[in-house]
Amino acid sequence: MAKDEEKNSQASAAPNEGEVKAKQEQTSAKEPAAKAGETEKVADLQKQVEELTKQLDDQKDQNLRAQAEMQNMTKRFKKEQAQLLKYDGQDLAKGILPVLDNLKRALEIEVEDENGQQLKKGIQMVHDHLEKALADHDIKEVEALNQPFDPTTQQAVQTVAASGDQKPDTVVQVLQAGYVLHDRVLRPAMVIVAQ
């Protein structure tokens, strides 16, 4: 009987070995399929990583562009503010210039009596104070008389023949003074030019 049991156990063990081999073959067959599935997942994940990296790079680029635009806008705003402050008194100065012209005309009048002299002295003081106030704000008269004609700051209203020691294209008479604020012409000088 012991022999029969031994045969039975060997017979039962033999199918177990066959089952083990079959299971191993199934597992071996499943492994490439599992590896193929994992490879696909890895490829998908790598693709997602690449897409997300590209999106991140695009966002970084957009962010840098937005920051640069903001910096440019800030610089432009500051420059415009500086220009506004620099030329702040332009309109007021243009309104005052005719008053200054009238004061100059009043000073050109010849007076002989004491009252006229006192009045002229007062006009001269007002004129001087007004010119000083304009100069304090960088509003200056254009130097034109006996200077070469400059079309950027002067306007020729008449030409005359050059005489004596006058050079051609030289201002021989100023009819109305011109003024500049910093580098901007408020009013060109009205001049007569020798030809």
Curated annotation (Swiss-Prot):
Keyword Iron: no
Residue segments, region Disordered: 1-60
Comp. bias regions, Basic and acidic residues: 37-60
UniProt cross-references to PANTHER family, sorted A to Z: GRPE PROTEIN, GRPE PROTEIN HOMOLOG, MITOCHONDRIAL
Subunit structure: Homodimer.
Assigned protein family: Belongs to the GrpE family.
Protein name (record): Protein GrpE
Organism: Limosilactobacillus fermentum (strain NBRC 3956 / LMG 18251) (Lactobacillus fermentum)
Gene symbol of the encoding locus: grpE
